[in-house]
Swiss-Prot record:
Taxonomic classification: Bacteria, Pseudomonadati, Bacteroidota, Bacteroidia, Bacteroidales
Protein family: Belongs to the MurCDEF family.
GO molecular function, one term: UDP-N-acetylmuramate-L-alanine ligase activity
EC code: 6.3.2.8
Function of the molecule: Cell wall formation.
Top-level taxon of origin: Bacteria
Protein name stated in the entry: UDP-N-acetylmuramate--L-alanine ligase
Length: 462
């Protein structure tokens, strides 16, 4: 089936962030778009307002007539949806073309110059930065992102003039193997998704295969020190980047003062002084070096790079400041792997040195909790105070003996609390705070506004 010739597209698992970018793409192309998701969310409601016909019950009777013809309807699904799903089974049994999200994204973008950002962590912010740097310059771009970029309030960007497409290259279920990168970035390769890959070696190998997909006229930009051996085709250039050591692209003269961060960007035959971070957290220096490097390699001028970095507002839920006063700060972040959790905490502690940092963490997935309990505990022990919630299961069934308790018992700081999500607001109301970091990839974000209200009330008390 030629994706460009279908008239209707139906999404099974419409509320996922990657799926929603495709929904917006097909809506922009004038297709009829519908789908199913398990629960309503702000994102699915936004998609409905934009024209998508979405329902929340796995029921074939709710599939609209516009999506009942196998001849002109493409069905897209996410691997998070179980194979036993009733609607998915119906479409397969009735001869519909059924494709994984990753394959559809690969088909859409294969004719453009794909700038693909991969990594266990850092890929959403880095790809969003890169998209913004290109978009606000004459170079321009299309983009499929894994977060809602606040500068544009969308995870999709389209251009009538540019053939660059920035793509967040997701390693889950080996999705990024469907892509054909012109340029690729690897930000990190810390083992994750071991329920899919089985071993850390298999996880690392998937990144090596990803590098073999880069077009011969392209390049790879990889963070210095990552344990990945590229398998590049002949003609593919390789660059490294870093923050703390010399590489092809790196930062130096880093200054952190009064909640602001500036640095000098250094690359082959280029130096850009006094780059200011629009989202001033230390980890964004690293993300920024990678994004600036790819943008510069594709013709973005130094003055546009500086302007873009200063005006970058960040994706939702990536160091998202919800409250920033002299008395208390509230930050929401998506970190859900021990390494990125550690980065988040250290960035906040450096930015707000001398102030008490309280972390509210919701673990994501039973398998990830089981596989990395000790590493999670080590990262969380960097906090001054911890409130630990129950595990958010997402696509998984409970595993006997696996709960937040196995993390909690290994955390070494004395000020720690284990509570259910439903109890959180009462726990927060009983405490006093200076900097609060709410972290996790589940539904902890729905508690950010209620927590903010409690903190604001505490500020107003005489």
């Amino acid at each position: 089936m030629d994706i460009n010739k279908v008239t209707a597209v139906y999404f099974v698992g419409a509320g996922g962030i990657g799926m929603s970018a495709l929904i917006r793409y097909f809506l922009a192309k004038g297709k009829r778009v519908g789908g199913y998701d398990k629960t309503p969310s702000d994102l699915t409601e936004e998609l409905k307002k934009e024209g998508a016909d979405i329902h929340y019950e796995d029921n074939v009777a709710l599939i609209g007539e516009a999506f009942k013809s196998p001849d002109d309807t493409l069905v897209v699904y996410t691997p998070a949806v179980p194979e036993s799903h009733t609607e998915l089974t119906y479409f397969r049994a009735h001869g519909f073309e059924v494709m994984k999200r990753a394959r559809v994204l690969g088909e859409i973008t294969k004719s453009s110059r794909g700038l693909c950002v991969a990594g266990t962590h850092g890929k959403t912010t880095t790809s969003s930065m890169l998209a913004h740097l290109l978009k606000q310059s004459p170079v321009d771009c299309n983009a499929f992102l894994g977060g809602i970029l606040k500068n544009y309030e969308s995870n999709l960007m389209l251009s009538d003039t540019s053939d660059f497409t920035v793509i967040e290259a997701d390693e889950f279920d080996r999705s990024f193997h469907w892509l054909t990168p012109y340029m690729a970035v690897i930000t990190s390769a810390d083992p994750d998704h071991l329920d899919i890959y089985g071993t850390a070696e298999a996880y690392r190998e998937s990144f090596e295969k990803f590098t073999s997909l880069i077009r011969p006229d392209g390049c790879l930009l990889i963070k210095k020190g990552i344990n990945v051996t590229p398998r590049l085709q002949e003609g593919v250039k390789k660059y490294t980047y870093s923050v703390t050591e010399i590489a092809d692209f790196y930062a130096e003269n880093i200054r952190i003062c009064d909640g602001n961060i500036t640095f000098d960007f250094v690359g082959p035959e280029i130096r850009i002084p006094d780059v200011e971070l629009g989202v001033p957290v230390k980890v964004n220096i690293e993300n920024g070096v990678a994004a600036m490097a790819i943008a510069w390699l594709n013709g973005v001028k130094p003055e546009d790079l500086k302007k873009g970095m200063a005006t970058f507002a960040g994706p939702r839920r990536r160091f998202d400041f919800h409250l920033k006063t002299d008395q208390v700060v509230l930050i929401d972040d998506y970190a859900h792997h021990p390494a990125e959790l550690r980065q988040s905490i250290l960035s906040v502690k450096e930015l707000y040195a001398g102030r008490k940092v309280t972390g509210i963490f919701q673990p994501h997935l039973y398998t990830r909790t089981r596989d990395f309990a000790g590493d999670f505990a080590a990262s969380l022990s960097l906090l001054d105070e911890l409130i630990l919630l129950d595990i958010y299961p997402a696509r998984e069934e409970p595993i006997p003996g696996v709960s937040s308790r196995i993390i909690f018992d290994k955390v070494t700081i004395p000020s720690k609390t284990l509570c259910k999500k439903e109890e959180l607001l009462d726990v927060v109301a009983a405490g006093k705070y200076e900097v609060v970091l709410m972290v996790g990839a589940g539904n902890i974000d729905r508690l950010v506004e209620p927590v903010k209200e409690i903190l604001c009330k505490q500020i107003r008390k005489p």
